[in-house]
Amino acid sequence: MNMKYITSGLFAAMIVSSTAFLTSCADDLEVGKNIDESAYSGIYENNAYLRDGKSNLVSKVVELHGETYATTVKMGLSKTPNTATSAKVKIDAAYLETYNKAHNTDFALYPQDLVTFANEGILTVNANTKSAEVEMTIRAGEGLQEDKTYAIPVAISDQSSDITIKDEDAKHCIYLVKDMRNAGDAYKGEGVMQGYLFFEVNDVNPLNTLSFQLENGKLLWDVVVLFAANINYDAEAGRPRVQCNPNVQYLLDNNETLLQPLRRRGVKVLLGLLGNHDITGLAQLSEQGAKDFAREVAQYCKAYNLDGVNYDDEYSNSPDLSNPSLTNPSTAAAARLCYETKQAMPDKLVTVFDWGQMYGVATVDGVDAKEWIDIVVANYG
């Protein structure tokens, strides 16, 4: 009797426990609730994107040192197709207005009759591969203006029905072309190691750069950095700004005499920037602060006809975090400044000296560092 009682009691307890469990589950279960499935909407799509084939860059600067420049345009896919699929590439002249507006630039369209695509621009991605390339040739022309940047916006068109294009950025890549045929004294060939010369602006004439030549007559130095202007806090405006000491400003004011002769020989001239013992710094700007400072740097390069900038993260004090233009020092903040600078002047060089927080982040907003840093100058101690 006792055993029967215990078994019956255990069975009753299990029923009560199971009922409680089911009741508890019912409290958490919402039948018929709408679920946001937008995150899964593209899982079956095969998204295409466009790049320069040689560099794998979305935005590629091309310097014409000869009569022709050859490269390839690459279309990549997010998935491997089961069967061959295809698309075409073409020049999308209308897109240039959108691009110029986004970057606050005024690039002119490169003469379309000087650009040709092999195979009528048709790209065929074979089964079990994820990309295809087509040759593109850019020819020089008599009407090109020196010291002017032209743009070639290339777009995907006539794609097969199984190819999806996510947005305009994925659909396009752009070539920024400069005629350098008469400014080739420093050019030693594509992909050749370049020499960077940092010189102290307080007591050195930049034209001394032209005194150094190789045995073949080519100039030794490819890039000259004016070392250096500063980032400083503008108390009246309440934001960081570019500050030039009298010697830097003298070179800028007399750039036709002291700087442009270098550029006419093919030497790139960059404005060096570093901290200057106050609350601002190149690696401690907020996102908005970086955008504002980058736009000012771009205006300096445009106004004084310079080839870009070199950032050096030194000599900055702790930031005032109550200022919306500033943030804690970090490699992420430094990367943001480089990214925003490239956005503001895509045809110019954005370079950094590998010191402090100035280098070490791989992407900003999903964009690879090679798109917004052109050169990292190593610290040799």
Q: Predicted segments — roles?
A:
Residues 16-17, 136, 276:
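Short intrinsically disordered, low-complexity segments
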Residues 16, 123-126, 284, 325:
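Short N-terminal micro-motifs specific to bacterial/archaeal maturation
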Residues 11-19:
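Hydrophobic helical h-region of N-terminal Sec-dependent signal peptides
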Residues 20-24:
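C-terminal motif of bacterial Sec signal peptides marking the signal peptidase cleavage site
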Residues 26-218:
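Acidic/polar, low-complexity intrinsically disordered N-terminal segments immediately downstream
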Residues 1-11:
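Bacterial N-terminal signal peptides that target proteins for export
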Residues 187-206, 218-381:
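Chitinase-like catalytic core of GlcNAc-active glycosidases
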